[in-house]
Amino acid sequence: AINPGQVYGKLDGIETRDPAFGLEAVWIAPEQREHAQTLGYTVVDTATVVATHISQLLSNNAAKLLGYEEVQQLMDMLAKNSPKLVDGFVPDVMPLGSVVKVMQNLLNEGVSVRDLRTIVQTLLEYGTKSNDTEVLTAAVRIALKRMIVQEISGPELEIPVITLAPELEQMLHKSMQATGGEGPNIEPGLAERMQQSLLDAAQKQEMVGQPAILLTSGMLRSTLSRFVKYTIPNLRVISYQEIPDEKQIRIVSAVGQ
């Protein structure tokens, strides 16, 4: 019995955590199922828990499973339907290693690479302008923005987001510029406070059944994503440029105020 964030009573059983998403849960006897559902718990059987956990493990480690051979196979499959798109792409526009790195970057942040046509089209456009895989990944993410936002927040037109206070974001921008784009030099005490504030904001979102999304500038997005990846894994970090035109944002909290 998984606590989705708001339940109306406690259950007798063995307290645990859902292995896939880390939510509070209780192992209960089969005859308690109906009672648990009445209290607001999401009840799943053992097989579903195991299957979901395995699926989550595969998703979390997808980037490690994708290498040169797998990407070449994907290119070969795309070439069957779109030969002109793939012809001359590798290695004329960019080496296979760069394509692999961009796709690994996407998978590392839970972005599907199934829309291979859009990924290749974007790399064809930007690959002649830059060989920086971080820049190329950002360009691909913008091209995939509708899919990214759809997978995070669903079909709702309004997206609830967490932001950084303007003063904090500006300070991080200046720090990033001072390091030549290597990443902001954050004082340890500030980093700890940011982590805690972002964790609190993310947990509040999860408690009301909404996705935890941090909205920030394109310059800071990848750095902040790495900053929270292991401490707040359910917090998705997107940039202003990744919000589709038809979507509206609703700021639920501003960290640093």
Residue ranges and their predicted role:
Residues A1-Q257:
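Membrane-embedded alpha-helical signal segments
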